[in-house]
Amino acid sequence: MTDLIPLEQAHCLPRKGSDHKLGEARLAELLPQVPGWELAEAGMALTRTFRFPDYCRTLAFVNALAWIAHREDHHPDLGVHYDRVVVRYSTHDVGGLSENDFICAAKTARLYDQGITG
């Protein structure tokens, strides 16, 4: 699906059932496309910590990320702290990671890299 266009330009599709859970080979293909992200929980989740100079910019990032999550209908778990946000993606309906997680990880990284909050 996302092999033809960059992940950050793709859009999430409804995914339910274990048929959409990514296997180890596909995870190995997609992970290099989202630098800075790590597999967590034995490959069941994708995580990354984003750092900010102050709380205002931290919350600006969270609010911008909320808009992306709403638009894609794919929502991360967030750990919000004064100077950082821990973002965790996993697709509960497939019991692990789906392509939607990588699409949203790429969009999240682009948001951060573009300096939307600063």
Curated annotation (Swiss-Prot):
What's a Gene Ontology MF term here?
4-alpha-hydroxytetrahydrobiopterin dehydratase activity
Answer whether the UniProt record assigns the keyword Lyase to this protein: yes
Q: Name one GO biological process term.
A: tetrahydrobiopterin biosynthetic process
What are the UniProt keywords, alphabetically? Lyase
Catalytic reaction annotation: (4aS,6R)-4a-hydroxy-L-erythro-5,6,7,8-tetrahydrobiopterin = (6R)-L-erythro-6,7-dihydrobiopterin + H2O
Q: What is its EC number?
A: 4.2.1.96
Q: Which InterPro entries match?
A: PCD_sf, Pterin_deHydtase
- Is Hydrolase tagged as a keyword? no
Q: Which Pfam families match?
A: Pterin_4a
Coiled-coil segments, which residues? none
Q: Which family does it belong to?
A: Belongs to the pterin-4-alpha-carbinolamine dehydratase family.
Protein name as catalogued? Putative pterin-4-alpha-carbinolamine dehydratase
Q: Organism, per UniProt?
A: Xanthomonas oryzae pv. oryzae (strain PXO99A)
